[in-house]
Amino acid sequence: MTEESEETVLYIEHRYVCSECNQLYGSLEEVLMHQNSHVPQQHFELVGVADPGVTVATDTASGTGLYQTLVQESQYQCLECGQLLMSPSQLLEHQELHLKMMAPQEAVPAEPSPKAPPLSSSTIHYECVDCKALFASQELWLNHRQTHLRATPTKAPAPVVLGSPVVLGPPVGQARVAVEHSYRKAEEGGEGATVPSAAATTTEVVTEVELLLYKCSECSQLFQLPADFLEHQATHFPAPVPESQEPALQQEVQASSPAEVPVSQPDPLPASDHSYELRNGEAIGRDRRGRRARRNNSGEAGGAATQELFCSACDQLFLSPHQLQQHLRSHREGVFKCPLCSRVFPSPSSLDQHLGDHSSESHFLCVDCGLAFGTEALLLAHRRAHTPNPLHSCPCGKTFVNLTKFLYHRRTHGVGGVPLPTTPVPPEEPVIGFPEPAPAETGEPEAPEPPVSEETSAGPAAPGTYRCLLCSREFGKALQLTRHQRFVHRLERRHKCSICGKMFKKKSHVRNHLRTHTGERPFPCPDCSKPFNSPANLARHRLTHTGERPYRCGDCGKAFTQSSTLRQHRLVHAQHFPYRCQECGVRFHRPYRLLMHRYHHTGEYPYKCRECPRSFLLRRLLEVHQLVVHAGRQPHRCPSCGAAFPSSLRLREHRCAAAAAQAPRRFECGTCGKKVGSAARLQAHEAAHAAAGPGEVLAKEPPAPRAPRATRAPVASPAALGSTATASPAAPARRRGLECSECKKLFSTETSLQVHRRIHTGERPYPCPDCGKAFRQSTHLKDHRRLHTGERPFACEVCGKAFAISMRLAEHRRIHTGERPYSCPDCGKSYRSFSNLWKHRKTHQQQHQAAVRQQLAEAEAAVGLAVMETAVEALPLVEAIEIYPLAEAEGVQISG
């Protein structure tokens, strides 16, 4: 009796493609590990019949056992015939033989199936999927398979024999691949066991498995072949790159023809879609046309594949019947429109997938950081932040994350994927039809516009370059210039944020802006681990670690990290202050400074505490307030300036001006010997020498007291100041441009002059919201508000005493050092603070005023005594009558 044989079919779940060898993997982790090492260590299973003496798991139905032999890591197995090879190069050459034999050959009548020798129960036998004949060796099996291929060169691949109904799942994007050939066990009945022929084999239930491995990201259609997938993708892009030949095979394999293949070599089978893509352009065209013909009509000849597919309703041309069916369904059922964004989709499945994006459902999880994304495309774009190199690299130097764009780009190269010597593709040339990636997408910071000098802006553009007429930037291609003028100088903002309604010029800017609403910060700093929402902000932040300031002012030498900050700084040199406060008239050269200034007039600050009615100008002050007052914890303070921060990370980011002032001054002026703390200040100081002239010398400013504070003391008379009131004739004052009309004092900026004028006008535009006391400057109000909050951020490092104002700490330090820098010019007595000197100077003023009053009184008494002595003398009657009115007018009493 012939025992019913078992069929074992191996299913492999594939979802991801390796960009180097086109190997398919079932998970993203596997393809990433494979691409890092690119050592094709693949494990497949061979199913055979166990020896009688081997203990194996028995099948309850047949009682026979199956064993599984794993392929060693140093061996490579062909997925077509199961042959084991020792190196990747041998595997490639072996698979090339399969591909070369796929070409249609002359029709040869099918040879009768040779009678196989008696089968042994301890060996693996190979079954023909067409006639069910069994063979003991691969050579006999492949030779027999070749007879079927010669007889029907355009016949569709034989369906896979399945013992049970096939259930394809999971759904979209995860196809199951059935290996074409299966291994059957031989009968163990006796010596007379014969091999069943094609006629004697009973008809079994067969199921054809359609392999749909490639999914279009635009319309969600599935395709079986990469070529069909790429042709379909070309319909979505305006200017696809024309097809060219794929990387060719090795020269010795190309030179050989199918007739020259030795008989001992295994004959080819139709290559599975998960094998290496090693076909040349001609073989691809033949195979694609044959497969299309088989899909259209399995009984027609191959010439039917070239029939053009037109829609009868709109006369639109399609590349495949699948696309035509999708299009016809849109005529019957209509299109599917999203109710939220009005986007149109060709199928309900693509609309459902799109609605999942609106519902913020995240099905794709990043294995590195745990972030979830709604689509696989967003996940792959996110993984660029974790991988130093993109997933797909080309020998010409370009890298791609999208597989479709990489395959399109690879077609532009010649044989072997090497750039053509006649028309090399530069690495920076963008592919036509794909937009240039934005800075937030590529991870590279957007290069701010460098300062353009008059010489470069006035000169003509270099040959082969294109210059923008608005900003004088030069580009190597006209397409880059057009894109620059469109996105940089265009005032229209078409892209709107769906949450807050803010408009943007680019979609990438909207995506970066949306992260401010979601709180996502997927780009951490490798130095301090602070996360950012865009690569451009990360690159700008990293300049704080490196200390690099690439944008330098040509007037004063001050350097900046951003070109926008440099442009605003130039307004200071140009004395251009376009932003004026309507309350007090103070002008600013930056709009945000005017905004911060106006908060002091209203008394309402933007950051309000939820637990108390207090409000603050800065978020940092609010966080410190909540930490100290409501949480009862101590903040992190800067040891140099005493500023408080809610976390140690914010303290490390703090750039202390007091520490910079206390740093040793290493830059010395060669003209006057003055030392400054930076090269920019030295350059500005030398520019002041050049403006003063060769014969003039700049006056050296004393370290303390500062000139603005010393001039605030009202002096009764010039004599009280002595020699300190006049300047030395050998040291003329520094030239300054703005003069006060009241006291003739000079200032360098308009803001300083505006603040000084409040002394004469009595204006105090900064009231305290707690007690109502007003101040002339916002810094005075900030120091005053610490008296209400009880905050004392400035602590003495010697005794630990804390102060609310930094000036009080500086005065307190002189107690420990014994320094008394403020001396009275009248008596020579010295004091630690200027306020004590000011109080002492008042006593001298009072003494001086008392002495003046005494001198005036003595003078008046002397005048009255002289009048009285004159009145004692005897006068004639007429003269006496004339004197009386004069005496009464003078207030002198005449006795007698």
From Swiss-Prot:
Low complexity: bias regions: 707-732
Modified residues (Phosphothreonine): 724
Zn finger limits (C2H2-type): 16-38, 76-98, 126-148, 214-236, 309-331, 336-358, 364-386, 392-413, 466-489, 495-517, 523-545, 551-573, 579-601, 607-630, 636-659, 667-689, 738-760, 766-788, 794-816, 822-844
Principal subcellular localization: nucleus
Keyword ATP-binding: no
GO terms for biological process, alphabetical: regulation of transcription by RNA polymerase II
Gene Ontology CC: nucleus
Subcellular location: Nucleus
Compositional bias (Basic and acidic residues): 274-287
Record-listed Phosphoserine modification sites: 113, 164, 298, 717, 728
Superkingdom of origin: Eukaryota
Gene3D superfamilies for this protein: Classic Zinc Finger
Gene Ontology terms, MF aspect: DNA binding; zinc ion binding
Ranges for region Disordered: 239-301, 434-460, 687-733
Keywords: DNA-binding, Metal-binding, Methylation, Nucleus, Phosphoprotein, Repeat, Transcription, Transcription regulation, Zinc, Zinc-finger
Classification via InterPro entries: C2H2-ZF_domain-containing (IPR050636), Znf_C2H2_sf (IPR036236), Znf_C2H2_type (IPR013087)
Family listed: Belongs to the krueppel C2H2-type zinc-finger protein family.
Designated name of the protein: Zinc finger protein 574
Species, as recorded: Homo sapiens
Gene: ZNF574
